[in-house]
Amino acid sequence: MSAFTPASEVLLRHSDDFEQSRILFAGDLQDDLPARLDTAASRAHTQQFHHGQVLSRQMGDNARFSLVATVDDVADCDTLIYYWPKNKPEAQFQLMNLLSLLPVGTDIFVVGENRSGVRSAEQMLADYAPLNKVDSARRCGLYFGRLEKQPVFDADKFWGEYSVDGLTVKTLPGVFSRDGLDVGSQLLLSTLTPHTKGKVLDVGCGAGVLSVAFARHSPKIRLTLCDVSAPAVEASRATLAANYVEGEVFASNVFSEVKGRFDMIISNPPFHDGMQTSLDAAQTLIRGAVRHLNSGGELRIVANAFLPYPDVLDETFGFHEVIAQTGRFKVYRAIMTRQAKKG
């Protein structure tokens, strides 16, 4: 988090207006402007563990990672700066949560890239904080309003559910494949061998569907799941519970909080971080896997066929196999052998 995003650059055009404000930053926080903007006081709330890590190093306890913000997270704030995400239900969850806590009269700024659909903020907040567009630059829009009425927020009403081959999948706004199993994960699942045993790590677990599907035909595996997303962590816990599957689930920036070694690491790694394309997580996953695989253990991932992962796999493991593919996706397999770099 060094260079500012276009949304932050638009905010910086108005930096003089924020010098006396006590600001809560929230939403799709992709840089460290919350720690660097000159304000009377700044807090930040994020549902993304990796962004929380960066901001906590600079803001200490004034930056917090969690699914739901609390009264303590908004304490003494008179201004909200909300970065609009690419996912509208995610924005609604977060904004209804935050506006239910902030006092009437709070200044509300919403900023985001036009392609993210930020203009729909006007309609979403019309009954609570009517917005007007106050700036347009860097293909972004900046909207301002004042909180006139607090919404009633009930996190339980945002839960969703769908079924995959008799399995129940619990979801929340912001979780990958919230409305159904994606094609890439389907392809990866088709390669998993029944009656597998050992310790399995599911990185970027989303709603937990890969793990529960694997556990159904391999009940002796011991599951660990992790994700950067607070909604994903909670959704995975709920999915495991709904299917009577045991496993440990926690927030982690790829391997940052992972301890120990595993017999298998599975993943459908993301290649977007908010609105931005990013291969960092997948490359960190591949390179770091050798520090978390037992000898003979394997990394198995699915990815869009056009993404440049074969070179990283070969560089790290010495070789790789493509064990399934379609026109759009490939499932890669790499084995932990003496050829692998020990990291």
From Swiss-Prot:
Assembly information from the UniProt record: Monomer.
Protein name: Ribosomal RNA small subunit methyltransferase C
CDD domains on file: AdoMet_MTases
Domain of life: Bacteria
Subcellular location: Cytoplasm
Family stated for the protein in its record: Belongs to the methyltransferase superfamily. RsmC family.
Catalyzed chemical reaction(s): guanosine(1207) in 16S rRNA + S-adenosyl-L-methionine = N(2)-methylguanosine(1207) in 16S rRNA + S-adenosyl-L-homocysteine + H(+)
Catalytic EC class: transferase
Keyword Transferase recorded: yes
Function, as annotated: Specifically methylates the guanine in position 1207 of 16S rRNA in the 30S particle.
Keywords (A to Z) from UniProt: Cytoplasm, Methyltransferase, rRNA processing, S-adenosyl-L-methionine, Transferase
